[in-house]
Amino acid sequence: MAVKSLVFRRKFPLLVTGSLLALQPVAALTVQAADQFDCKVSATGGWDCSPLQNANANLPPRPAHTATSVSTAAAGSSVSGSGGETVEAEPTQRLVTESGGRALRSRSADYSHLDWIPREKLTAAQLAEIGPYCGGSYIEPVRPGMDDGAPSDESPTYVSAKASRYEQEKQIATLAGDVVLRQGSMQVEGDEANLHQLENRGELVGNVKLRDKGMLVVGDHAQVQLDNGEAQVDNAEYVIHKAHARGSALYAKRSENAIIMLKDGTYTRCEPSSNAWTLKGNNVKLNPATGFGTATNATLRVKDFPVFYTPYIYFPIDDRRQSGFLPPSFSSTSDTGFTLVTPYYFNLAPNYDATLYPRYMAKRGMMLEGEFRYLTHSSEGIVNAAYLNDKDDHREGFPDYSKDRWLYGLKNTTGLDSRWLAEVDYTRISDPYYFQDLDTDLGVGSTTYVNQRGTLTYRGDTFTGRLNAQAYQLATTTDVTPYDRLPQITFDGFLPYNPGGMQFTYGTEFVRFDRDLDENIYFNDDGSIRGKRPDASLQGLARATGDRMHLEPGMSLPMTRSWGYVTPTLKYLYTKYDLDLDSQGKTDLNKRDESFDSNQDRSLPLVKVDSGLYFDRDTTFAGTPFRQTLEPRAMYLYVPYKDQDSLPVFDTSEPSFSYDSLWRENRFTGKDRIGDANQLSLGVTSRFIEENGFERASISAGQIYYFRDRRVQLPGLTEKDLKRLNLDPSGLDNDSWRSPYAFAGQYRFNRDWRINSDFNWNPNTSRTESGSAIFHYQPEVDPGKVVNVGYRYRADARRFDSSRGTFRYGNEDDIIKQHDFSVIWPLVPQWSVLARWQYDYNKNRTLEAFGGFEYDSCCWKLRLINRYWLDVDDDAFLVQSEKADRGIFLQIVLKGLGGIVGNKTEMFLDKGIQGYRQREDQAM
């Protein structure tokens, strides 16, 4: 039985248990003649020993050894038996320094001495924690005291063994057979042990194991200081269970604060039988409390071959952040020449950090980029900056160009209290050629402009007020200057009372649109004059600036039942303009016999009746029970026509037609155009829902029936504008009595397979206006398999031409006919192929194609990918450059140390393959 002794600060408390104690409260421990005593545990927890007159116990002798780095019993060729005879010693244990980075099979053929559990013996929960390519895992066994948080000097020592002797004169206890010493969270095991009570020290020999809070150290011989927990294990191997890390050392020392010091130590995340990579150092320190390790005179070895040396390295032993160099990246382009980026990460505090990106470019010099991130109880944000003294002179003489290239920015979100929210998104660059010439690691979103916005929001119980100031700085010379909103004030809400169930809402907006037109000349990349900037092509009202106020009060009466609803709505739309127009704009209007009115307003009523029904039934399909719903919907919309051609367009466009367009109150976005409407939208949705709530399929279809032609159009798309350009206005289909048929659907074959599709067919022209079908496969239990097949078509493009500042229609270049295929597929558990092919049938060209392979194991990953791509604007579906780029990308990741090269590969894989991020998150 177990008896807990008293806690001593300088003299270790001792507890001895074993098979001899099974049948009696306290066992009698016997030794040979003149030195033999009968020792019992006293009531005070100490030892009560008296001479034993007739002792002839068959106990093993006390191990005789010296405190060498390797066990004497292991190193010698013979030892003395209890009867004085000489017996052959066991074969000499192999040294860890001879293992070449692998674990010692001589200790256990299946590496069970390192708590290694093969994959076939893991539980389902344990399998979920490792990748499909891992052959097993390090599983820490449950043991008493493993979660004990008491300090070592305040914890009693528990001891158990199969047999024991005690020399009272020397106060040495000798233990043999499955010896276990436990103090606090630390536990030491061995075949034999000596416990020196006077020195509070223990020595263990044979199959030594030291365990402490998720760490295991295995060796041949150990010394343990029992008053503070310090220990040394010789010929040591170690495991950090949660980090799936292991290593070895000539000897390992555990300090009082649980830091492990390794002499000639190694560190790796590879499986016990693998030496794919190891980090080896003269002196290695592992600190579980901080989650980091250090090594001096360190070499990175691949297959036991040294490939990299550093006098000092600081590396993670778990998932916590640390300061240090991040994986470098290198490339070569015609603009910059050879480029090398060596980022350095500063882990300044748990809630803020910084990253420095020194970028050497052979053609341009050294560029410095920096990023600072912070998080407080009420705010979060990023501050970034970059500077380059450009030594490339090919843009000398270009407007707005300077050799001092720079960027700075701030993104911040601050909750001032529970109602006030402040946001800043501000970036400024030195010149409009910045992103054409230079790459950046600062995560700036668009390469055609940078955002400069500040917003203050107040959220009341029944309203939301917002003050916004937003400007844009162009990062190109081929687009017109966008309008700034300086300022924009919105106030939206509803009244807190509902007489008779009525709901009263209101929306208000005041905004000042302004911009400074730039009509300077600009150059081609070869330095030749290309012409004036696009702002010079703006004509008439496109050159206007001014104030716009919009008021939108409304009332509705929702009538809802379990089987359906009817909601009539009445709104009043009032917009007032106070405009300015330069002399060039007025001259353009005069040439068209049009006049300019600086003060204009527009008032329109809006009537809407939205209604829907809900039906469901229980049905069975292919043996599977479903609940099928039928949800018809009808919406009538009336807005009278009012000529709006004399109003400028500041922030308005017309989105593509889809099923959602059936239920919009205005076919335009923004407030500069209110579409006239006298129409009835009819649609129906049906869903198939399984008993567990899983939606197997849904399909929607609908159409708009027009009782009047749509006369309000955007500039450039009016009947007068199209005739002036010799284009057929009937192509816009504004006088038909019905819209295209709109379809949208989704079908899930199971939780792994799904297909999404939308389709718009115009019966007036007997052609497909737009459509897409996207097939996605990614098993829920194995997200490492990904297949995407998609096709999209669009021929109804009404696009804003950013190079002319007007809308256009009927341009063949705007037609989209593209397929997109991407795949990640494992060939064998550790090898996968990755590929994407995006092709444009309209211009018979490949937009992007890449293919390669990936090798992934428990300790390292390699990707090699060949890529071809054009610079594509995904929002406008237009290629920005006809010149193709090509590259071969290599990515190497040593798990536990991070990427060595090629981390930018992640960017185009994440963007190009739907499901890639879920795959990586699951693998982690």
From Swiss-Prot:
Signal sequence region: 1-33
Coiled-coil ranges (or none): none
Question: Which keywords has UniProt assigned to this entry?
Answer: Cell outer membrane, Membrane, Signal
Annotated segments matching region Disordered: 58-102
Which family, according to the similarity comment? Belongs to the LptD family.
Its subunit composition reads: Component of the lipopolysaccharide transport and assembly complex. Interacts with LptE and LptA.
What this protein is called in its record is LPS-assembly protein LptD
